[in-house]
Amino acid sequence: MKLAIAALLAGSAAAFAPAQSGKASTALNMAFESELGAQPPLGFFDPLGMLADADQERFDRLRYVEVKHGRIAHVAFLGQIVTRNGIHLSGNIDYAGNSFDSFPNGWAAISGPDAIPQAGLLQIVAFVGILELAVMKDVTGEGEFPGDFRNGALDFGWDTFDEETKLSKRAIELNNGRAAMMGILGLMVHEQLGGSIPIVGEM
């Protein structure tokens, strides 16, 4: 769990939060202050110095990581809400007859007395690995920006938008991804603390 929390924080730390006053920025950092993502209500923030002496390639790499973690957090947060409200896939998860709803929600499904068997966890890791290495990336090399995984197959009308609309939608995704990262982190913490919270219910 500590690893998951660290990954969520590291993925977003270089891109947002209030600008610090009284400290001179380097010329490179000043160039990044106008990048997409340095936007209200938080502005530009690099508390860990991850952009110190960084070039555009490193910035793009960090932005790619942030976008990817934001998308994962979206799915994770939605999954928490759905399963904790009693909605699960039908049928059995294995040949032993264990149903999807027979396993606990949240982190308890990964680590605990009633967790998913190791073979099941290995399947999850393998599936995520395949997505990471072969699917969720710019396969064709034609991506317009970090996180553009259309690969000539998915569009959803993106090319019909003007540049202002594209920037707006990308900014919205960044902000929502940041909120989702903090949201799933909050749920993970509350799960360890116990108790009940609105919408999600009993942790």
From Swiss-Prot:
Transmembrane segments: none annotated. GO terms for biological process: photosynthesis, light harvesting. One of its GO terms (molecular function) is chlorophyll binding. Keywords: Chlorophyll, Chloroplast, Chromophore, Light-harvesting polypeptide, Membrane, Photosynthesis, Photosystem II, Plastid, Thylakoid, Transit peptide, Transmembrane. It comes from the Eukaryota. It is found in: Plastid, Chloroplast thylakoid membrane. Residues 1-30 form a transit peptide. SUPFAM superfamilies: Chlorophyll a-b binding protein. GO terms for cellular component: chloroplast thylakoid membrane; light-harvesting complex; photosystem II. It holds the Pfam family Chloroa_b-bind. Its main location: plastid. The light-harvesting complex (LHC) functions as a light receptor, it captures and delivers excitation energy to photosystems with which it is closely associated. Energy is transferred from the carotenoid and chlorophyll C (or B) to chlorophyll A and the photosynthetic reaction centers where it is used to synthesize ATP and reducing power. The LHC complex of chromophytic algae is composed of fucoxanthin, chlorophyll A and C bound non-covalently by fucoxanthin chlorophyll proteins (FCPs). The ratio of pigments in this LHC is; fucoxanthin: chlorophyll C: chlorophyll A; (0.6-1): (0.1-0.3): (1). Belongs to the fucoxanthin chlorophyll protein family. This is Fucoxanthin-chlorophyll a-c binding protein, chloroplastic. It comes from Trieres chinensis. The lineage of its organism: Eukaryota, Sar, Stramenopiles, Ochrophyta, Bacillariophyta.
